[in-house]
């Protein structure tokens, strides 16, 4: 899809206050590392991730998303009455229903005429939300829209650490699917898009494309399994190498399609 009337007017983010290093995580996993003969520094060496950030315990995604949405609206200088859509585009949410976007919409004070919904699609939620809003602007249905999301990785990492520490059957092979979970951090971002005629910046969104390889859908799967893990924290299992190869191959095909 090519756009003629869509601009990326502003981008904003909220950075979590708690810094957690890869060394700290490995120190907590010292009994596992010692039993399996894993060298310290492995986590940073294999991923390049020195540290990640988390929000304070108990922080709801919608609370942070409200702050970020307010920030992007203020940064744009756009009258909030022009915002015709608010999409919450992260994996993390305040509850199953209503949509987390509803609380953000109320917190920011956007018009009742705005479309309000969640779009949750793994790491792609914000990009998917951008295209939904861009399509609406291009069609003339709205003049502006905000897509915002907040991911909170604390519970996933903490839960993974506890599971690894209490798994007496763990081997160097069986720990691999949990490895990617130890890299997860937190953060929040928002993008405001608007009609070209409304834009002060003229920064156009030229287009977007999508392509799916659903055969790879089992390479990274996460969620809450209370019966299996004994608590309500999420866990995730990832075939990191397989996912990388599948993702790069798909990205190449999508890029070639987008250029046509």
Region locations from a protein language model:
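Short glycine-rich or small-residue beta-strand-to-loop segments that form or flank ligand, phosphate
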Residues: 85-91, 118
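Short, surface-exposed alpha-helical segments at coil->helix boundaries
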Residues: 37-40, 66, 98-102, 248, ...
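Acyl-thioester C-C bond-transforming condensing/cleaving domain
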Residues: 34, 70, 74-80, 94-98, ...
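Condensing-enzyme catalytic core mediating Claisen C-C bond formation in acyl metabolism
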Residues: 1-57, 170-245, 253-256
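Short, hydrophobic/amphipathic alpha-helical packing segments
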Residues: 65-69, 126-130, 248-255
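Short glycine-aspartate micro-motif
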Residues: 5-7, 85, 143-147
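ATP/NTP phosphate-donor binding region
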Residues: 60-61
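Phosphate/pyrophosphate-binding loops at sites that engage ATP/ADP/AMP, CoA/4′-phosphopantetheine
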Residues: 68-84, 253-260
